[in-house]
A protein has these predicted regions:
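Short active-site-adjacent structural elements
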Residues: 40-42, 68-72, 84, 93, ...
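A short alpha-helix-loop-beta-strand transition element characteristic
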Residues: 79-87
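Active-site adenylate/phosphate-handling loop in enzymes that bind or generate adenylated species
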Residues: 2-78, 121-134
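The feature marks non-catalytic terminal segments
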Residues: 86-135
Length: 135
């Protein structure tokens, strides 16, 4: 129920809302993501600003200025690379628009979200959360 070119951004805004709720419930003080500036349409500066506008928590992005090769090297160093390349479907692969917005506006995102039951969807997601401890 929203413009296709905003699918990814709206999903990311929903993920940030859900993440903030879960973080606050667990006593966390910030959100941490693995984004690298400009690697994909949803990681341009305008897209990140639009995504971050739904949270009041700090969003830490330790990889923000690194290129893909640097990130791959780090993932190998911490034994995360093999897991990171496992095939699976996620919202970014299933719902990727043909022409995603690279310079979104906050007002357009907010307008597109008006047709969604945002609070209800967040509540449902938070209540359905399962936690796993990875050692």
């Amino acid at each position: 129920n929203c413009p296709e070119d905003y699918f990814t951004l709206i999903m990311r805004r929903m993920m940030m809302r859900i993440s903030e709720r879960l973080a606050r419930n667990s006593g966390s003080l910030a959100l941490i993501t693995g984004e690298s500036l400009g690697q994909v349409a949803s990681q341009t500066l305008p897209a990140l600003v639009t995504t971050d506008s739904v949270t009041n928590m700090p969003v830490l992005r330790p990889l923000i200025g690194m290129d893909k090769e640097e990130i791959i090297k780090i993932s190998r160093d911490i034994d995360a690379f093999e897991t990171s390349i496992l095939p699976y479907e996620d919202c970014c692969t299933v719902f990727t628009p043909k022409h995603p917005k690279t310079r979104p506006t906050l007002s357009a995102c907010e307008e597109a979200e008006k047709s969604l039951a945002v609070d209800e969807l967040i509540e449902k997601a938070v209540n359905g959360t399962e936690f796993s401890v990875i050692e």
